[in-house]
Amino acid sequence: MKSGTIDRRLLTILLVVFVQMLGASLIFPVLPLYAQRQFNMSAEMITLLTSAFFAAQFLSGPFVGRLSDNYGRVPVLIISQIGTVISFILLAFAPSLGWLFFARILDGITGGNIIVAQAYITDITPREKRTESLGYIFAAFGLGFIFGPALGGILAAAYGPTVPFLVAAVAAAAVVLLTWYALDETLSAEERLRARARRAGSLTVGSLLGGAPWALPLLMILLIAFLGQFALGLLQSTFALFGEAVLFQGESQQVTDVGIGLLLSVVGVSQLFTQTFLLRRLARRFDEGQLVVIGSALRTIGMTIYALVTTPWLGAFGSLFFAVGFGIASPPLQSMSTSLVSDQDRGSVLGMFQSSVNLSTIISTAIAGVLFARGPTVPYWIGAATSLVVVMAIISLKRWMPTQPVRTSEA
C-alpha cells in the first residue's frame, strides 16, 4: 500500500475522530450539573448515570469490534454514530430521569466508534508504527477536547443547558456524513468473508482462559488497562461536581460552567501537545513498557495535585500532569495488546481492550459518587493510589512479554 494512501486515510479517520470528540466533549462539563440542577439528582445518582453509559458500552464493545472485523469498519462506524445522534437529541428533550438514563445507555450500546477507529488505524499502519499512529487518535481527542468543553460551558451559560446537547447532535450527524462520503473501507470483501468464516475460532474471552501462549501477557495488559482507567473514571464522573464544590466554590452558575469547561480544555491542549510532539520523541528513546511507566507516574502526580488544591489556577496543573500522563501511557499499552494477536484479530482484541477499560469505568464511576459524598477529594486520592499500582504492574508485565509477536498474520 502506498504511503500517500495511508496518509490520506489516516488524516480522514483522524478528522472523523476529531469531529466526534468535539461533539461528545461539549456535554462533558454540562451533563452532571444539568442532571443536578434540572432533575435534583444526588452525586451518587449522577455518577451512576455515567456508569450506565459505560456498562452498555462494556457489553457491546467486543461485539462491535467483531462486527467491524466481519462486515467492515465503515458501516459499523456509521451505525454507531447514528445512535449517538439520537442519544444527544434525547438528552436535550428528556422529560424525566428515566429518559436521561435511556439516552446514555443507547449511546453506550452504539458507542463503538473509538474501537472501530482504532482498528481502522491498525489496518493501515505497520506494527512498528502503531504506537505513534494510535497516538494520533489521542491527539485528535485532545484537539476536540480543547474546544468542546469550553464551548459546551459557554453555550450552557449563554443559552441554557440543553443547547450543548443539540450542538453535539449536529456534530455527530456531521461525522455520519463525513464517514459515508470521505472514508474508505480498509477490509476487502475477501478479508471480511474470512473473518466471518473464522468466527467459531476467533479471539474471545474464553480463549484467554484456554492456556494459549499469548493468554497471560494479554490478560495482564487488560488488567493494567483496567487499573489505569480507574483513576480516569473517578475523575470524569466527579470533576464537574468537584469544580463546583471546591475549585469554584461560591461562584455563580455561569462562572462555574465556563470555568469547568476551560479546565477541561487544558486537558485537551495537553493531550494534543503530548500526541503531536512529546510521544513521538519519547517513543524513539523508550520502549512501550517504559512509556506506560512514565505516563502512569505522571497520572499519579496529577491526581495528587487535584486532591490537594482548592483554586482553579492550581487545578490546571493537575489537568496538565494527568492529561500528559494519560496521553503517554495509553497508545503504547494498546499497541502492546495488538502485537500479541494476528492481523485478523485486531478488531477483537481492541474490543476486549476497550471492554476492560469500560468495565473499570463502570466500577469507578459507580462508586465515585459514594466516595465524593464522603469528601470531594476522596476520589482523587483513590485515583492516585491506583495509578501508582499501574507503575508496579507494568514493570512486572515486561518479564512476560514476548520479544516478538506470539501470533503472526496468516499468509
Language-model features: where?
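Juxtamembrane intracellular "pre-TM" segments in multi-pass secondary transporters
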Residues: 1-6, 184-221, 411
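Short amphipathic helix-loop junctions that connect adjacent transmembrane helices
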Residues: 30-43, 238-258
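Helix-breaking motifs and short loop linkers at transmembrane-helix boundaries and internal kinks
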Residues: 40, 72, 93-98, 309-310
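Residue-level signature of mid-helix packing/kink "hotspots" within the transmembrane helices
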Residues: 54-62, 112, 145-146, 268-276, ...
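Helix-to-loop junctions at the C-terminal end of transmembrane segments
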Residues: 61-72, 273-287, 372
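Structural signature of the two symmetry-related core transmembrane helices
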Residues: 75-90, 290-304
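Cytoplasmic helix-loop-helix junction between adjacent transmembrane helices
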Residues: 103-142
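C-terminal transmembrane helical hairpin of 12-TM major facilitator-type secondary transporters
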Residues: 289-333
